[in-house]
Amino acid sequence: MLQIILRRLMKALLWFAAGSALVVLVLRWVPPPGTALMVERKVESWFDGEPIDLQRDWEPWDKISNNLKIAVIAGEDQKFAEHWGFDVDAIQAAILHNEQGGSIRGASTLSQQVSKNLFLWSGRSYLRKGLEAWFTMLIELLWSKERILEVYLNSVEWDEGIFGAQAAAQHHFRTNASALSEQQASYLAAVLPNPRQWSASHPSGYVSRRAGWIRQQMRQLGGDEYLQGLNSSRRW
């Protein structure tokens, strides 16, 4: 009996691995029609008795401002071009910080955030973390860095029901994602740790200071030259 159970479990795991790899491979070229986070937000709104309309318009890489691309990297994951999905130094620093009793600090890379937003539910369980690591490895193996950032910018939440760069640009600044200035981009990047509590268009003092720091980091990264190097980091 035990052997039968183990064989069935192994078969199920193999089917899951093959199926998830196929989905990630398809999404290398096909825009994701939605995300797990969008479904979660919609269900939450139904249970709260206040259904919301989700706003999201997919924009290809060349229709998104370089300012926003650099701002998000500067604010969220400055080792994005170097790592293969996991920032070991940031993980170690977060563990040490959390053990010392500070507020819980995350260390998720952009690749990990894409995995979580696209495929998984919110929470901190070991199962979810394990699945996040699996999807992160698949994404890093099968997508270019450019594609990872493109999907991130079209999937990330920027306010209640606002998903992706185009919806965020229109909602906060009444402009298009392609026209975002350095300052506007820095404010959008500054609210990403908590986009439903912080506002890019009506920033608090903390958000304004964080946006100023992000602009400094954008210039140190090298701006458009950094993106040119990122574009050349294709896998195959």
Swiss-Prot record:
One GO location term (cellular component): plasma membrane
Catalytic activity line of the entry: [GlcNAc-(1->4)-Mur2Ac(oyl-L-Ala-gamma-D-Glu-L-Lys-D-Ala-D-Ala)](n)-di-trans,octa-cis-undecaprenyl diphosphate + beta-D-GlcNAc-(1->4)-Mur2Ac(oyl-L-Ala-gamma-D-Glu-L-Lys-D-Ala-D-Ala)-di-trans,octa-cis-undecaprenyl diphosphate = [GlcNAc-(1->4)-Mur2Ac(oyl-L-Ala-gamma-D-Glu-L-Lys-D-Ala-D-Ala)](n+1)-di-trans,octa-cis-undecaprenyl diphosphate + di-trans,octa-cis-undecaprenyl diphosphate + H(+)
Family: Belongs to the glycosyltransferase 51 family.
Role this protein plays: Peptidoglycan polymerase that catalyzes glycan chain elongation from lipid-linked precursors.
S-S bridge residues: none
Location in the cell: Cell inner membrane
The protein's name in its UniProt record: Biosynthetic peptidoglycan transglycosylase
Originating species: Pseudomonas syringae pv. tomato (strain ATCC BAA-871 / DC3000)
Top-level enzyme category: transferase
Pathway assigned to this chain's UniProt record: Cell wall biogenesis; peptidoglycan biosynthesis
Domain of life: Bacteria
Major localisation: membrane
EC number: 2.4.99.28
GO molecular function: pentosyltransferase activity; peptidoglycan glycosyltransferase activity
UniProt xrefs under HAMAP family: PGT_MtgA
